[in-house]
């Protein structure tokens, strides 16, 4: 049987108190809407139809070719939102999943189980439900003595008995597609909210003696719909635990998983050690047996095997096997560190390629440079790459020794095996096997200090 999906993403999300559409707020590095789409993909829908409204263009920009779009100009309830998809789906045979775009914790496995349950029980409609300790605010699932679903009652419309029911409607459903759109023609706004409730189609099916079922989630957390920043933080917490648990099962050691932030698309090999307060973001990849210490932040970077990163930040760069970075180093976008490079404390590298076994131990800036292998940077070395308007390249050969407090003014080339004397300002190219000295001779004026204000007075 063919599957389709309707994703509800038209709401403003007033309680979020944000200029951004609710479904575009992020959980673990992805928008809530992207999380939903990844889960929906597990049912292999032939067509996704996203109902958009508030700031529709922003939602379209996130999804692009992943979905068809229909516009809901007025938000008149969930039933009204699904009506908007009629032009795309009404005449098609198959099953249609209806899901809200603000449910980032729902898993693909649960949606696949929901579809299978629906098909196996030959239902015209199947509701995804959950058991809640505190069901206040949720629509209740009302069953008869034969345990069949009779109706769904919203909180504001529920009587005293119905409000005690703990089985709640998650807002996710599967319908026979044609019967869904036929039933939608018969719902109205005669309720406390004055809206078109999608849940009213369940009552219509029951009145017609059609089969309605309910599939109960194993994990209540999956049912969370995010309506405010408190729920967003809850979703973030649950997702973080879920992601970190998966990495631990795959052989990653966490010093404190509750204090480690790893986004959804990060890849980590076995035998990696991650200390507390580490953040791994974007499409970062961490190689086997690497160690990330407290305070490290890695964004969209590729980290090799047996790398040690100590309390440092690495962005959009490639780090080869055996490299050590930090503490307090910053590897900025566009950098490549080859095998066994050492970048020490308070060193910044930007847009540079650094060859194997090169060392910059402390207090150094390497920007827009191509550096060979076995180079040593003395403390305080600066590549002067910017004149206020343009950036210039520094090229350093193999086995070069750069003396402490050298200032290398680009554009500049230093040949293999060359040396720059400590304290030099280098403005011209240095030939291989040469030493470059670019500093004034020391001058000593005996007794001159007595004339200066700092000198102790008798």
From Swiss-Prot:
Top-level taxon of the source organism: Bacteria
Stored SUPFAM superfamilies: Nucleotide-diphospho-sugar transferases, Trimeric LpxA-like enzymes
Gene3D superfamilies in alphabetical order: Hexapeptide repeat proteins, Spore Coat Polysaccharide Biosynthesis Protein SpsA, Chain A
Pathway: Nucleotide-sugar biosynthesis; UDP-N-acetyl-alpha-D-glucosamine biosynthesis; N-acetyl-alpha-D-glucosamine 1-phosphate from alpha-D-glucosamine 6-phosphate (route II): step 2/2; Nucleotide-sugar biosynthesis; UDP-N-acetyl-alpha-D-glucosamine biosynthesis; UDP-N-acetyl-alpha-D-glucosamine from N-acetyl-alpha-D-glucosamine 1-phosphate: step 1/1; Bacterial outer membrane biogenesis; LPS lipid A biosynthesis
Renumbered residue ranges of the record's region Linker: 230-250
Chain residue ranges for the region called Pyrophosphorylase: 1-229
Renumbered residue ranges of the record's region N-acetyltransferase: 251-458
Primary role: Catalyzes the last two sequential reactions in the de novo biosynthetic pathway for UDP-N-acetylglucosamine (UDP-GlcNAc). The C-terminal domain catalyzes the transfer of acetyl group from acetyl coenzyme A to glucosamine-1-phosphate (GlcN-1-P) to produce N-acetylglucosamine-1-phosphate (GlcNAc-1-P), which is converted into UDP-GlcNAc by the transfer of uridine 5-monophosphate (from uridine 5-triphosphate), a reaction catalyzed by the N-terminal domain.
Homology family: In the N-terminal section; belongs to the N-acetylglucosamine-1-phosphate uridyltransferase family. In the C-terminal section; belongs to the transferase hexapeptide repeat family.
Name of the protein this chain belongs to: Bifunctional protein GlmU
């Amino acid at each position: 049987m063919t599957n389709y999906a309707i994703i509800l993403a038209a709401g403003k999300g007033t309680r979020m108190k944000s200029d951004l559409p609710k479904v575009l707020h992020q959980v673990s590095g992805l928008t809530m809407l992207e999380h939903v789409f990844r889960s929906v993909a597990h049912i292999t829908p032939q067509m996704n139809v996203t109902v958009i409204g508030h700031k529709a263009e922003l939602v379209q920009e996130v999804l692009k070719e992943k979905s068809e779009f229909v516009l809901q100009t007025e938000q008149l309830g969930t039933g009204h939102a699904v009506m908007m998809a009629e032009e795309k789906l009404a005449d098609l045979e198959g099953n249609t999943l209806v899901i809200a775009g603000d449910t980032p914790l729902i898993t693909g496995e649960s949606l696949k189980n929901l579809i299978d349950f629906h098909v196996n029980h030959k239902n015209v409609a199947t509701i995804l439900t959950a058991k809640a300790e505190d069901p206040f605010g949720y629509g209740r699932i009302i069953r008869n003595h034969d345990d069949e679903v009779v109706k769904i009652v919203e909180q504001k419309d529920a009587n005293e008995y119905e409000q005690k029911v703990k089985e709640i409607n998650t807002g996710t459903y599967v319908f026979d597609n044609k019967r869904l759109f036929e039933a939608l023609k018969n719902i109205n706004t005669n309720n406390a909210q004055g809206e078109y409730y999608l849940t009213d189609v369940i009552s219509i099916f029951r009145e017609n003696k059609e089969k309605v079922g309910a599939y109960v989630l194993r994990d209540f957390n999956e049912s969370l719909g995010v309506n405010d920043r408190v729920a967003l933080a809850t979703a973030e917490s649950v997702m973080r635990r879920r992601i970190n648990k998966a990495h631990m099962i795959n052989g990653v050691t966490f010093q404190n998983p509750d204090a480690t932030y790893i986004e959804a698309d990060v890849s980590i090999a076995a035998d990696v050690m991650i200390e507390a307060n580490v953040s791994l973001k974007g499409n970062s990849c961490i190689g086997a047996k690497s160690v990330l210490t407290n305070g490290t932040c890695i964004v969209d970077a590729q980290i090799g095997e047996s790398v040690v990163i100590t309390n440092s930040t690495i962005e959009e760069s490639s780090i080869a096997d055996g490299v050590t970075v930090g503490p307090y180093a910053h590897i900025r976008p566009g950098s490549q560190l080859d095998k066994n490079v050492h970048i020490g404390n308070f060193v910044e590298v930007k847009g540079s390629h650094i060859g194997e076994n090169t060392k910059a131990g402390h207090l150094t800036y390497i920007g827009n440079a191509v550096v060979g292998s076995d180079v040593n940077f003395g403390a305080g070395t600066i590549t002067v790459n910017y004149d206020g308007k343009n950036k210039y390249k520094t090229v350093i050969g193999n086995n070069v020794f750069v003396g402490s407090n050298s200032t290398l003014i680009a554009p500049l080339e230093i040949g293999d095996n060359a040396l720059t004397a400590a304290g030099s300002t280098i403005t011209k190219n240095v030939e291989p096997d040469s030493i470059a000295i670019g500093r004034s001779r020391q001058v000593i004026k005996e007794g001159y200090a007595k004339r200066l204000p700092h000198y102790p007075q008798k």
